Regions:
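Short loop segments at secondary-structure junctions
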Residues: 11, 190, 205-207, 238-241
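Intrinsically disordered, low-complexity regions
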Residues: 12, 25, 52, 162, ...
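Functional-site microenvironments in short loops/helix caps that host divalent-cation chemistry
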Residues: 57, 68, 72-220, 227-229
């Protein structure tokens, strides 16, 4: 199973400007060199790692209905397969018996039940940071999109109400497909730990979203245990130069 990736070099663009439209806060991020997959993980790639056969007609569709935690675990499994150093250390303990006193929103596991730490020097597969994702999506462009939306993305106005295989639309200038539209993509970052706890950032918009949801700067959040039919993920690797 080949993961086609492109290299984004540090300094390829100016420090990326990030915006939190909820609070109005702005900041810049200096992004190190990294590799990022040209497509989101497909159902065929997901099943191949697990030794499961895939209907050829379904193999090129994005792998969806996958939680952030499942995506992190997949990254580590891929790293071990390719003899790379896993980027994540995952810790789990048995969950305590729940009561009204220990209930959390959406029955979300408490932080001490499932934890992930990221070794930022490891060369294994991982999820992109929100800043890395944004740099890769822009591919040196400016403005809310890197091209005409109908040409580059599957979204509400052209998807006919269902998901499509990857890489059918025009890629961006760096050869990445479907960074807008298609499926939302998990990022590493927490959205706002003080307000939303462990909720993670998702980017890019999906096949059922209106045009305003498919813009480079759009940041949304969801529970790391959540899994939806328009949410997938894209592999990234740290590169030391």
């Amino acid at each position: 199973m080949l993961i086609d990736m492109v290299r984004v070099r540090r300094g390829a663009t100016a420090a990326e400007a990030m915006v939190d439209r909820r609070t109005g806060r702005t900041w810049t991020v200096d992004v190190r060199t990294f590799d990022i997959a040209t497509t989101v993980v497909t159902l065929g790639q997901w099943n191949a790692l697990r030794g499961t056969e895939t209907d050829p007609s379904q193999a090129a569709f994005p792998k969806v209905d996958v939680s952030w935690r499942q995506a992190v675990a997949f990254c580590n499994e891929m790293s071990l397969r390719d003899r790379l150093e896993p980027a994540y250390t995952i810790t789990t303990i048995d969950a305590p018996t729940r009561s009204h006193a220990t209930w959390t929103p959406h029955d979300e596991p408490a932080p001490y039940e499932w934890g992930v730490t990221w070794d930022r020097e490891a060369n294994g597969y991982r999820l992109p940071t929100a800043a890395e994702w944004q740099v890769a999506c822009r591919a040196g462009s400016t403005g809310p999109r890197y091209g005409d939306l109908d040409e580059i993305a599957w979204y509400a106005d052209n998807s006919l109400g269902f998901m499509h295989p990857v890489a059918e639309k025009t890629p961006n200038a760096w050869g990445l497909f479907d960074t807008l539209g298609g499926v939302w993509e998990w990022c590493w970052d927490q959205y706002d730990a003080e307000v939303y706890g462990s909720y993670r950032i998702i980017r890019g918009g999906g096949w059922s979203d209106p045009h305003w949801g498919c813009r480079v700067g759009v940041r949304r959040k969801t529970n790391p245990e959540a899994a939806f039919d328009d949410l997938g993920f894209r592999l990234t690797r740290t590169i030391t130069e």
